[in-house]
Amino acid sequence: FCAVAMHSGVAPGTADSAATAMAAMHGRREAHLPDPPQALAAVGAAMAPLPPLLILHGDADNVVSVRNAAATAVLWAESLGARAGPVRTMQRGRRHAVRVTEYKARGRAQVTLREIVGLGHAWSGGAPGLNYSDPAGPDASSLVWAFVARQFKKI
């Protein structure tokens, strides 16, 4: 993979059963990556090192805790030797504001965390009238597409 995107998910390694998945969703499990030899055996050498990651998560999500987004960002960034930059707040028009943190290594963003202010458990920027969709959020589909396209340009 040249890029990974995650919207309202849990960090790798936080669950290994239905019960631990529920605890992970509520932010009550610690995130961890498998030991490198286990990870390579499981997914092959193509996943070493980890690709850049985009994380989108609503700070009002009462199903999957936003703590998972931050835990994933830190875990992924640490594995790539990336450090957090300053948090920037962005807002376009009447859409929900977004707190953006970029974790950089070697001058490049390796992890981009976008915490969407006021977004519950819904697809950000989704179609109106659909379940689990919030049209007032930034357009997650466009953000993911643009992020992945930028990563393809680097290979």
PLM features: residue spans?
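Catalytic active-site module of serine/aspartate enzymes centered on a nucleophile-bearing elbow/loop
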Residues: L130-I155
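Short catalytic micro-motifs in class I SAM-dependent methyltransferases
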Residues: S8
